[in-house]
Amino acid sequence: MMFRLTSVSCFLLVIVCLNLVVLTNACRLEGSSCRRSYQCCHKSCCIRECKFPCRWDGKRATFQ
């Protein structure tokens, strides 16, 4: 009985660890805050926000 309880708890611990790895490696969607481009799903971090394409407000900002 002790062996079965130990193996079940180890199995559950592995599942929890795998879920944590998946959650920490998930990319961020457009509109989410970011610090680096690799954190965003489209690999585009503009002024601490995931945006694709990068839109720079200014004189000639004509992206549509």
From Swiss-Prot:
Expressed by the venom duct. Residues 61-64 form a propeptide. The modification Aspartic acid 1-amide is found at D57. Coiled coil: none annotated. It comes from the Eukaryota. Disulfide bonds join C27-C41, C34-C46, C40-C50, C45-C54. Keywords: Amidation, Cleavage on pair of basic residues, Disulfide bond, Secreted, Signal, Toxin. InterPro entries: Conotoxin-I_CS, Conotoxin_I2. Residues 1-26 form the signal peptide. It is found in: Secreted. One of its GO terms (cellular component) is extracellular region. GO terms for molecular function: toxin activity. The cysteine framework is XI (C-C-CC-CC-C-C). Belongs to the conotoxin I2 superfamily. This is Conotoxin Im11.2.
